[in-house]
Amino acid sequence: MQLSDFEKFQNLVAMFFERARERGDAPFLSAKHDGAWRAITWREAADRVCLMAEALRGLGLKDGDRVALVSENRPEWCLADLAIMAAGLVTVPTYITNTERDHLHILENSGARAIIVSNAKLARPLLAAALRAPCAEHVIGIEPLRQAQSGTLTFHDWDGLLAGKAKNGAGAARAAVEARIAGIGRADTACIIYTSGTGGAPRGVMQHHGAILCNVDGAAHILANDFGWDEEVFLSFLPLSHAYEHTGGQYLPIGMGAQIFYAEGLEKLASNIEEVRPTLMVVVPRLFEVLRARIMKQVEKQGRVANYLMGRALAIGERQARGRHRLLDRPMDFLLEKSLRPKIRLRFGGRIKAMVSGGAPLNPDVGVFFESMGLTMLQGYGQTEAGPVISCNRPAAGIKMDTVGPPMKGVEVRIAEDGEILVRGELVMHGYWHNPAETARAIQDGWLHTGDIGHLDANGRIVITDRKKDMIVNDKGDNVSPQKVEGMLTLQPEIAQAMVSGDKRPYLVGLIVPDAEWAVEWAREQDEKFDLATLQGLPAFRNAIREAVDRVNGDLSVIEKVRQFTFADEAFSIENGEMTPSLKIRRHKIRERYGARIDALYKA
């Protein structure tokens, strides 16, 4: 395996088969069954991909047809994705949290002729949509669906399809697939990924093979040159239907010949990390915030010595983040390497090379926290329309947590007159599926208009200010970044989530979700019964949250200060539609629900 390999691959399936030939009987995809991790080897995976690809062609599917894929993260997700592409088809990854309405939009918009779904539970809303979508013809259940045949849909069993093609031998299937993929080029569409819709109905982003290969090439160069390329282990737990995990958690590991473990779920993530001991992790900022809060609470309970060491580690980390490396810090740095930091690293398995944050902006203080604990943090930047990774921090360029690093290999970046970040390169999508008007707005003269505002620092690293569409412009014409203020609010132990508003208004106001664990402790100390709705009506509780807001205001400029706030009825979540699957808040949905309450703050 060499870095030069990535430029020669014509498609993602060719890259996979090359790695499968090199890795042979080495473990590739691992998941837990009956309490034990079980692996599929590279050779076994390649055979199954070929058999399923031929089974899909056997259903009458033709080159370029779309196949929707609805499943939790598991080995079959990867196998299905590769098989769809090996059949000359196009994958349409779909979130397992989608409603019937969401599924219907994607099925009708993509024109998917076939659907692969993992189990009966996920099939319920999906099949209700499929029966209304005239394009859908075939449904394949990875697990038995126990579904009666319908007049418009034909149901198939995953294992049954594999067994049917295995009768002719895996060799015959391999030969057919090899011949077919020889005609698939880097410019051909690999998948249509629907954006999570922070601002409206999801649009289908057409990602071609070259876009993802360009991303894999750039990321592999960073990892190989800055950290060394060895026997890498990835733990996959972000949704594979999101471009970030699809590229960073699936195709990057494939390109590096790595082993992929599939987490059992967020509730078991901590124990899975300790068991799997990953070398690389791809994470979204919200999870880093949660992990930071948990570590701080646990250290707080361990007494004065642990708290003292934590304080010194953070102080040294903050100085180093500002470029101040003091000789006086070396003895304490040495002590921390022998005491606190190894314990923290063990929480992450003990052999992690780097943790990559992406999908949303990372609060610099969170990044500095993990760096202070001896864990290397790399913040990436991108969007589905760009493969999705545009840039990433790396040691060779100097890691600075208020930047998202320099553009990756093969990526051109320039800043427009209004501050918008523009991107050009093979990583840029070919457009939005069946949406030429939106495509023309997004891509002009070959440059992708990202909708993000930022600049390049003296070392060529990208600094993101905010989303162009999210930027608050107050009644005096001043620009305010809501993400900066929200990020500072949610670092307070009293506050779990926040959204600030203030467009065309004299000042900012906030919608706040109190931290549940903190609220339990507060109620116990105040001898109050814990009921969040009741607590939010107590003046003393509100004053405690006010103190947290005021702490943040002390570090903000006049136009950034949050003057008034109100409480949300419940946490923002994927289930209530107020967060995307990558855990970004959906501002338009939150405003729909709480708009009147927010507006009332200006009348108080």
Range-by-range predicted roles:
Residues 54, 59, 86-164, 544-547, ...:
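Structural core segment of the AMP-binding/adenylate-forming
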Residues 406-474, 491:
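Conserved ATP-binding/catalytic segment of the ANL
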Residues 213-233, 240-341:
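Conserved AMP-binding/adenylation subdomain of ANL enzymes
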Residues 39-43, 190-216:
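Conserved AMP-binding A3 loop
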